C-alpha cells in the first residue's frame, strides 16, 4: 500500500453516531494523497475533514442549487449585469494579486462602469 493513505475504516458500514454518515474507502495516487495531506495540514484540519469540505464545494448541495437550470439562470443574470453595467477587468485583478505581500500592495480594484451610449 505504498503511497496510499491508510484508511481509518475499511468497510462501507454506516457509522453508529449518525445514520446519514457512511465510511467509504478510496484509493488515490500517491502524489494526490501527498497534496491532500499537505493542504489539510495547511488548513489545520485532518485529511477526512478537508476531503469532506472539498467534496461539499464541488457538489450542488453546497451551492444551494437543485438543478442545472437554476445555476445557469443565475450565471446568465450575473453575466448580463456585467455586460450591461461593467465589471472588474481581469488584468486589474492580476495586478492586485501580484502586489500581495509586497511593500507596494495595491488596494482591491474597483469595478469599471461601462460607458452608456
Swiss-Prot record:
Reported phenotype of the disruption mutant: Cannot be disrupted, suggesting it is a functional antitoxin. No visible phenotype when the relBE3 operon is deleted.
BP-aspect Gene Ontology terms: SOS response
Alphabetically ordered keywords of this record: Toxin-antitoxin system
Described purpose of this protein according to its UniProt entry: Antitoxin component of a type II toxin-antitoxin (TA) system. Neutralizes the effect of cognate toxin RelE3, but no other RelE or ParE toxin.
Protein name per UniProt: Antitoxin RelB3
Species this chain originates from: Caulobacter vibrioides (strain ATCC 19089 / CIP 103742 / CB 15)
Amino acid at each position: 500500500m505504498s503511497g496510499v493513505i491508510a484508511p481509518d475504516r475499511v468497510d462501507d458500514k454506516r457509522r453508529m453516531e449518525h445514520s446519514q454518515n457512511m465510511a467509504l474507502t478510496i484509493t488515490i495516487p500517491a502524489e494526490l494523497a501527498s497534496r491532500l495531506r499537505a493542504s489539510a495540514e495547511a488548513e489545520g484540519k485532518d485529511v477526512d475533514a478537508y476531503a469532506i469540505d472539498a467534496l461539499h464545494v464541488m457538489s450542488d448541495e453546497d451551492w444551494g442549487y437543485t438543478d442545472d437550470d437554476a445555476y445557469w439562470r443565475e450565471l446568465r443574470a450575473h453575466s448580463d449585469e456585467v455586460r450591461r453595467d461593467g465589471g472588474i477587468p481581469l488584468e486589474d485583478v492580476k495586478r492586485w494579486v501580484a502586489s500581495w505581500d509586497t511593500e507596494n500592495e495595491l488596494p482591491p480594484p474597483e469595478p469599471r462602469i461601462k460607458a452608456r451610449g
